[in-house]
UniProtKB/Swiss-Prot annotation:
Chain sites annotated for binding hexadecanoate: S65, S96
GO molecular function terms noted in the UniProt entry: lipid binding
Key word Lyase present: no
Start and end residues of each DegV domain: 5-287
Gene3D superfamilies, A to Z: 3.30.1180.10, 3.40.50.10170
SS bond list: none
Lineage of the species this protein comes from: Bacteria, Bacillati, Mycoplasmatota, Mycoplasmoidales, Mycoplasmoidaceae
Pfam families: DegV (PF02645)
Natural source organism: Ureaplasma parvum serovar 3 (strain ATCC 700970)
Coiled coil residues, start to end: none
Function: May bind long-chain fatty acids, such as palmitate, and may play a role in lipid transport or fatty acid metabolism.
The protein's name in its UniProt record: DegV domain-containing protein UU535
Amino acid sequence: MKKSFLIMTDSSTTLDREWAKNNDVMILPLSILRSDHTLIVDDGIESKPERIYEDIDNGYTFQTSCTPYGVLIEAIEQKLQEYEKIIFIGISSGFSSQFNNAKNLEKEYQDKLFVVDTEDFGYSLEHLVYKIKAMLSNNISFGDILKMINKHHDYTSSFLACENITGLVRSGRIPKIIGTMLKLSKVTPIIKAEWKNHRAGMALNIRSAPHKILENINHVFDNQLNNHTIEKVCILQAGLSSERIDELKNDVINHFHVDKEKIVIRSGPPIFLVYVWKGALGIQVIANIPKKHVEKKH
């Protein structure tokens, strides 16, 4: 007898892989191509952060891409032998063609495959999975679950800062001329990750970047963030020391007056580490109030 629902996501999430296996969640691997044409499958084994940092130290650069189309089709076909329905929630369509590829298959698997553009990544996807699981266990209607998924990004905000922008410049995610200007001025760019990346100002350096990020996030929610309106705060880190992580937690607590139990720490997904490099940091907030200042899709 088939199970009712499978949640299918991808390796842009921070979700624990063992937990996923035991909870009817499949994490599809995205693809990482090293500059020597070595293909790294982002499966949490080939793509461990330590391996990525070592490759960067050895001078390699990277390009990334979606799950190969054939692998995606095979995964859907296989899982529909085990499950009645698949809910697909992967990386934002602004970062990858992953969503478009899955959406194109929705018609072929009508009433079996349901694909939603999350406009998100990282811990926001992890949190979304938990919400879906909770609603399923409480017998919430499938229609209401899909409505929640479609609106989830209205309650999330993500900002990043990286100490070394070389990976972003080489990949074309920051134009070379802007990259040169940033290196000469020795400032740290702040990146707003909302559907896709947007420039969100500068910090004097990586040490002062968290303060700028927290101010930006608060502005997104019209300065209404506090312990009552925040569900979770995730600190995304790329090889930071435990001391630095503790400093960031204190920054979040002092800025939002939020309980420390609402703060989680996650390593950045490898699909992003290959661009932002070691020393980068990010902060993702999930609130129970909607954003007021939103970047329009274009």
